[in-house]
Curated annotation (Swiss-Prot):
Source species, domain of life: Bacteria
The protein's name in its UniProt record: Small ribosomal subunit protein uS2
Record-linked NCBIfam families: rpsB_bact
Cellular component, GO annotation: cytosolic small ribosomal subunit
Residue spans of biased composition, Basic and acidic residues class: 243-288
Coiled-coil regions, chain positions: none
GO BP, one annotated term: translation
One Pfam family of this chain: Ribosomal_S2
Start and end residues of each stretch annotated as Disordered: 241-315
Molecular function via GO: structural constituent of ribosome
Sequence similarity: Belongs to the universal ribosomal protein uS2 family.
Naturally occurring in which organism (per UniProt): Anaeromyxobacter sp. (strain Fw109-5)
Amino acid sequence: MASALTTQGTAITMKQLLEAGVHFGHQTKRWNPKMKPYIFGARNGIYIIDLQKTVGLARGALRFVSDAVAKGGMVLFVGTKKQAQDAIREEASRSGQYHVTNRWLGGTLTNFKTVKQGIDRLKTIEKMAADGTYERLPKKEVAQLEREREKLEKNLGGIKEMSRLPAAIFVIDTKKEHIAVHEANRLGIPVVAVVDTNCDPEGIEYVIPGNDDAIRSIRLFTGKIAEACIEGRARYSTWAAQHGEERRPGEEDRDAASERGQKDRRDRRDRRGGGRDRERREPREDRAAASANVEVVRKGEVTPAQPAPGSDANR
């Protein structure tokens, strides 16, 4: 099934990126050299991310997510830092996907069988509360069960309906969520992530260079991924209605997705520093916006974004 990101919700433009402050990286002294291909330059001690590359890579990531969901897969949204929690929770819920916002439990993917036991326990307690079992138990025991339920809900509530491994994971801040990325890599699950100038892009099949601290930037990318999921689900529903059966992504789907991720990384390496390929890939209006952005940076008119509440003030 061919991808068709045609709706306004999944479109991403240079203007949106600029308004959200996506181009502001970290201080030059806090960078990861592996992010050099995605950096336009530095201004006032802060790295400026090449938004022209961000636009192209983001569009590729959105196409992949839409295709994965259209095949019956699910996406796990991961973002446990304070400024990402609300956006991750809201957008994952809106698009009917899974999410982790409290903390990543080691083995969530690689030891899912054990994690599933915790999920089953949570559902059991919820059933006890709903069917009147609580009314027949001593108050002390009910209080203990409620404390257990609250703890399980806090850690596992976002993946309560996850009966199998996701087709992909979407991550905000790969440096903080390195364990999640590592587990996904071990299982061959493609990783889509917003990667800032202080992060390591290795192991990320779909790198989206951008500010992973500013709330507006986080909400922009999380919302776009959610829209891609919604579009993918609509395509899946259409297919299921036409064929009268349900598709479930098997191991071959994840292998194919992993191969696509490896090919995508090779393509990105080939494109690094290549302006002609980039011009063929980008619409004319985005190239014009990129030129305007470059001119603003050269004139020194870039003003560093204010740190988001709860974020590191020394970016």
